[in-house]
Curated annotation (Swiss-Prot):
Biased composition annotated in UniProt, kind: Polar residues: 27-41, 283-294
Entry-linked InterPro entries: bZIP, bZIP_sf, Hac1/HY5
Major localization class: nucleus
UniProt GO molecular function: DNA binding; DNA-binding transcription factor activity, RNA polymerase II-specific
Organism per entry: Hypocrea jecorina
Protein name: Transcriptional activator hac1
Family note: Belongs to the bZIP family.
Segments crossing the lipid bilayer: none
Region ranges (Basic motif): 120-140
GO CC annotations on file: nucleus
DNA-binding is among the record's keywords: yes
Biased composition (Basic and acidic residues): 112-126, 265-281
Gene Ontology biological-process entries: positive regulation of transcription by RNA polymerase II; response to unfolded protein
Length: 451
């Protein structure tokens, strides 16, 4: 006790539970005021209720039940105490008023005496009450959040149900307006995927009418009120599968038909081209050329007159030539047909009686045709073609030359340029060499062929 009196005075807090410094034996003010009632309602110590809080959520333990529990605990505790005389810890009821501690023991100091232990017990009860209150508050907030979420989900579910009902009503109205027979609505209609087919989808395919079993099945489905769902595959006409061999045969037939059509078209084009070519060759055989104007010089100063128009041809007894027969006319430059026609001209006009064309100094004229060449008009020309026609030799030569012209026209020989120095001798001895050429070679005089 002397130690307690000699200890220095220290200023303490009002409550020993919240104080860090305390001296044993010091007297402190009571934790609970004198005005504190002997009985305390536990709800008075709790935090204020929230706005959303409902009284029915929290159940209050009746005091009568607490009293009965206390009595039961006391009876159970007194029975062994009387027999064994051993103190048993008595558990205080919830919400019981705590006694005032007699000591002010520091928090970190171990309690040794009964008063100090009582102080620790009171501090522990207060600490537990605060923890329980915070736990209840946290739980209340969580419950409120869950209730709010539940209300939102309920509202969303109600809206979805309303929308579903509206859609079902619209679907039924559309079915009634379209004439599709449907069964009576039930609460389970929204959970079923109903597929209805209109009557227009079941028309005949490719002009073929459905058989009687299929028609009866169709009528039964359309008139049935119990099963609106129809499998389209069961209503379509059955088609046998096509084998690969038949498919390949069909493709081959199509390809063969295309090839035949192309070959027929090519044959027609070739036939038309051959007919046109034959027609042109026939026209070339009938006509002769007199529109060209050749100028031929045969050795030295002897020259063959130039025909300016058809008058010269008429003077010689030749027929006029069409424009299409130009390649086979006399005056075509550097052509085989032109050379053959020049020889025919020499024979028909009887300018040279000798087959040797290089002997130009001698006059082998069978008749006097100077008047025709000086004035090659048809009025001054007195050559008689009948004299030539009666000549057998000249007539045979004319046939040979004409045959060669026809052969050249049929074979459609290409026009070639003949060198006057290198001439190929004629196959027929009676045929004259080409104009401007010699059977033995070049002459001393200038030999030229021009237009």
């Amino acid at each position: 006790m002397a130690f307690q009196q000699s200890s220095p005075l220290v200023k303490f807090e009002a409550s020993p539970a919240e104080s860090f410094l305390s001296a044993p034996g010091d007297n402190f003010t009571s934790l609970f005021a004198d005005s504190t009632p002997s009985t305390l309602n536990p709800r008075d110590m709790m935090t204020p209720d929230s706005v959303a809080d409902i009284d029915s959520r929290l159940s209050v333990i009746p005091e009568s039940q607490d009293a009965e529990d206390d009595e039961s605990h006391s009876t159970s505790a007194t029975a062994p105490s009387t027999s064994e005389k051993k103190p048993v810890k008595k558990r205080k009821s919830w919400g019981q008023v705590l006694p005032e501690p007699k000591t002010n023991l520091p928090p970190r100091k171990r309690a040794k005496t009964e008063d100090e232990k009582e102080q620790r017990r009171v501090e522990r009860v207060l600490r537990n009450r605060r923890a329980a209150q915070s736990s209840r508050e946290r739980k209340r907030l969580e419950v409120e959040a869950l209730e709010k979420r539940n209300k939102e989900l309920e509202t969303l579910l109600i809206n979805v149900q309303k929308t579903n009902l509206i859609l079902v009503e619209e679907l039924n109205r559309f079915r009634r307006s379209s004439g599709v027979v449907t069964r009576s609505s039930s609460p389970l209609d929204s959970l079923q995927d109903s597929i209805t087919l209109s009557q227009q989808l079941f028309g005949s395919r490719d002009g073929q009418t459905m058989s009687n079993p299929e028609q009866s099945l169709m009528d039964q489905i359309m008139r049935s009120a119990a099963n609106p769902t129809v499998n389209p595959a069961s209503l379509s006409p059955s088609l046998p599968p096509i084998s690969d061999k038949e498919f390949q045969t069909k493709e081959e037939d199509e390809e063969q038909a295309d090839e035949d059509e192309e070959m027929e078209q090519t044959w027609h084009e070739t036939k038309e081209a051959a007919a046109a070519k034959e027609k042109n060759s026939k026209q070339s055989r009938v006509s002769t050329d007199s529109t060209q104007r050749p100028a031929v010089s045969i050795g030295g100063d002897a020259a063959v007159p130039v025909f300016s128009d058809d008058a010269g041809a008429n003077c010689l007894g030749l027929d006029p030539v069409h424009q299409d027969d130009g390649p086979f006319s006399i005056g075509h430059s550097f052509g085989l047909s032109a050379a053959l026609d020049a020889d025919r001209y020499l024979l028909e006009s009887q300018l040279l009686a000798s087959p040797n064309a290089s002997t130009v100094d001698d006059d082998y004229l069978a008749g006097d045709s100077a008047a025709c060449f000086t004035n090659p008009l048809p009025s001054d020309y007195d050559f008689d073609i009948n004299d030539f026609l009666t000549d057998d030799a000249n007539h045979a030569a004319y046939d040979i030359v004409a045959a060669s012209n026809y052969a050249a026209a049929d074979r459609e020989l290409d026009l070639e340029i003949h060198d006057p120095e290198n001439q190929i001798p004629s196959r027929h001895s009676i045929q004259q060499p080409q104009s401007g050429a010699s059977s033995h070679g070049c002459d001393d005089g200038g030999i030229a062929v021009g237009v």
